[in-house]
Amino acid sequence: MTNKKLKSVFIVDDSAIERSMLTDHLSKNEGVEIKEFSNGESCIKEIVMGNVEEPDLILMDYFLETSPGSQSDGLEVLMKLKEICPASEVIMLTSVSNDKIKELAKNKGALDYVVKSQISYQQLDDVLQKHFS
């Protein structure tokens, strides 16, 4: 991937606290537009309906809460997002460090996989610096 300037980020996480913390952290980057979504369906719907432009980056929780019949599984949403906006990069966020899930997410199109923890913001900054500088 060619490094490009990060201009727009979508945050998809069922935790309002996580979304808020990520938004606060990413807001330190000048000129970055951030939109929050509490589930994968709302993010996909907004893109498909043309209500939002495709983002440069989507930060998405791997374990999204779902309702019965929902399509919010992180990998399913990842595959759909890569189908409808292939130029957008997706970084999966999760509270569980699991090499099998990490590899599966990357095989399905995720740019990277960051484990949520006290040091995850530094890891996230490192990934963003690597790909969007």
What name fits each language-model region?
Residues 1-10, 15-23, 121-133:
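Non-catalytic signal-transmission and effector/linker regions of two-component phosphorelay proteins
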Residues 16-37:
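Two-component/phosphorelay signaling modules centered on CheY-like receiver
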